[in-house]
Amino acid sequence: MKSNKKFIPYIILFGVTLFFCWLFAGRLGMFGSEVDWLSQHSVIPDYFRQQFYQTGELFPEFAPSLGGGQNIYNFAYYGLFSPLILPSYLLPFVKMSTYLMAVSFLTLSASVLLFYYWTGRHGFSQSIRFATALLFLLAGPMIFQSYRQIMFVNYMPFLLLALIGVDIFWEKKRFMLMTTGIFLMIMTSFYYSICGMLVVFIYGIAKFPLKQHRKIHTFFQFILPFFTAVFTSAFLLIPTACALLVRSGKSPKTQLKTLFIPDFSLEHFTYTGYGIGLSAGILAVLILGIFLFKYSEKLMCILCIIVLTLPVFSWILNGGLYIRDKAFIPFVPLLCYLTASFLQRIQTLFSRKYLPVILLTPFLIYLVCAGLYINQELGSNADKELCESLWDSSWKSEIDAALAQEKGLYRMEQDGSLKEDNSNMNRIWNPAQWTTTLYSSAYNQDYQTFLTRTFKTELPYNNAISHSTSGNPLFRKFMGVKRLINKDEKGNISTQLAEYAAPVLYATDRLISSEEYQKLSFPYNQTALMKYAVADDTTKKSTDKKAKIMDSAVPVKLTFPQDSSIHKEGDNYHIQTPKPIDTVLHTELKSDTQKQLFFLQFEVKNAKPNHSVTIKLNGTRNKLSAAYHIYHNDNTIFTFVTELEAGQEKIPVTFSDGDYTLTGIKSYTGALSLLTDTSLYQSEFIPDRTHTKGNHISGKISFSQNGYVITSIPFDKGFEVSIDGCAVIPEKVNTAFLGFPLSKGNHHLEITYHAPGAKVGKILSLLGLFLWGFSWFISQYVYQKSRCEHLSGHQPLVHLPKGSLVH
């Protein structure tokens, strides 16, 4: 009977966790958010699973379906080898979204229960253990991020296992639990595992037995699990590091001297979903703990204060990109442990059993109130009706049917409302469905540059890395988007076919040099790619290329409406309006008998930088995000390319509220033949569907002259190309894509991608497995030696406090 009672607190805590998940999130909608969860965390793991079913490869290297085709380690952050995601591979009948909601809740519950168990090992009273477990649960990021950016917190059970493993290491010199916890933490969330390992290190150093401080070999025994876990996970870490290090991006400039000035602002500790998110009392615990605690907890307080208040640690833990408190989320369990130690000390000093709980109660109430506010205002819970539409199996049926009909290699995308497109950027229904769309914090840099600087596709969202289905028909043709899947208001799904889309791989001898291409400005830098491919080795020269390109679009007069909110200032237009304006632009078409393409580009000068600017032209949306936005898109050049009906001179446009000026306005029209002309694609690649999957493309191509194979697959150094079994050096064509020379004749092509660092990572992981065996041997040796010393009359290595185990 007594043994059964010890499970009662765990059952109660499980129920309390369920209640607060419902209170903070479940009652507001799905246990998933429209921000990131719906567009990244629930769909990219599903793509991993689909590719595994297609290829049977547990160690994939390439993601052909996302962002034109990219190194799969660009997306490793989303759970490529996560121990929480891999079990879903055994459950093909369970939707990934459903699976993730269940796993997120169970992970959160396991974290709370493990925290309760961990504090029990240290002899804390049951009331203190229960109260601090609630504190841990109600910390800002715990529930909030369990349904938003789940990688912020889903490693917590393994972090707690590692902390428990530290205790076992100092008690028995056993390494396994500590090593396992660190390894699983890395595999679950390598980004947060760095800070997680710092937390484990701080806790372990503080618990280092005083009598052994001079035994260097004991310290090396302690850090051995860190090296073992890191080396074992090298098959993930090395190729991921190689993928991330080639990326370049803007980050806020940080002055070196400011990194070493302590910052004791309460916002670093108090309630937020993007930081530690505890109450202000935690700062008092850390400061008073220096005077009230014994050595180990005192050292923990000092080290925590140093790390949490010196900006240099935040900067380092955020990869040197910026200073943000989200990197400190792994400190939550350690700070809650110190809170338990503080309450226990108060209980001992004042001999009042319930005084600690009474002291903590106001802070818990505050966290509940703050949690209600932040989850309701910022949680952005996914709407059930939206999710039902996004997860409608009819999408898959339509896409599967279209793929079954396709003999060539083309792309296929979903098209819908702004919110639907945002949610579908990474959604793949069939691993043979290739797309141009992508929303990921890591990406192919050449492709990103092509989208945002070269072709200047529209940016409809707040950040510059969200690329949904483009409204630019030239871009869709260039990238081989042959089918757009739509759903009408009645829920009927249909396919819009673009017969003139470029094959993803084709051969041509119509080339223009990089030097010539770089001289072209808008819109000719777009129209040129409909007529020529850009390659440096241009063996065929032509003097009339530039003339043909310049004839592809002609300037056209554009007239803005006369409105009290729209003021003409020379060649510029100043828009100052308290509400959005729906109006039309007038243009003089050169022909009224057929459809035409309309090109428009201008610079936006925002007089109110903290207010976003959005302009929607003929259904295409461009946005300049507010300067305060954490991922400001810096989209000051708005580019629109759209189709106009025959004789259409009025173009619908919507100007958002704000105060801004449009300068450098360029407007052109081009013939529809830019879309319908396929003379550039002189020979189409015919894929072998059986072998074209995962990191491999195989098939045949015939060409009647010497030229180039041009692809719309972003270039990467990991590509290996062979023609008829002979290796060919791949080149960068069209400024950002894979290409290579081809001689005339009938050829068999093989394109294989090997992620840089993948092979080295696997070799180092084998070394890690050796270290596991070595660690086990060392732990057995040390444990037996300790036991023999104890039996022969010596004192044990470590004195355990009375009541240190769970009872």
Please provide the spans of the model-predicted regions.
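Membrane-interface coil-to-helix junctions
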Residues: 17-111, 134-156, 245-249, 259-263, ...
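Signature aromatic-anchored transmembrane alpha helix within multi-pass, membrane-resident enzymes
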Residues: 345-371, 496
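Membrane-helix boundary/interfacial segments in multi-pass membrane proteins
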Residues: 66, 143-153, 250-275, 302-351, ...
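Periplasmic/ER-lumenal interhelical loops and adjacent helix-loop junctions
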Residues: 218-293, 300, 314, 318, ...
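Membrane-embedded helix bundles of polyisoprenyl
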Residues: 13-17, 104-122, 126-170, 174-209, ...
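Transmembrane alpha-helical segments
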Residues: 111-119, 158-170, 198-206, 283-291, ...
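Extracytoplasmic/lumenal acceptor-recognition loop(s) of multi-pass membrane glycoenzymes
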Residues: 74, 366-381, 404-475, 502, ...
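Active-site-proximal, structured, solvent-exposed surfaces of multi-pass membrane proteins
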Residues: 2-3, 45, 554-791, 807
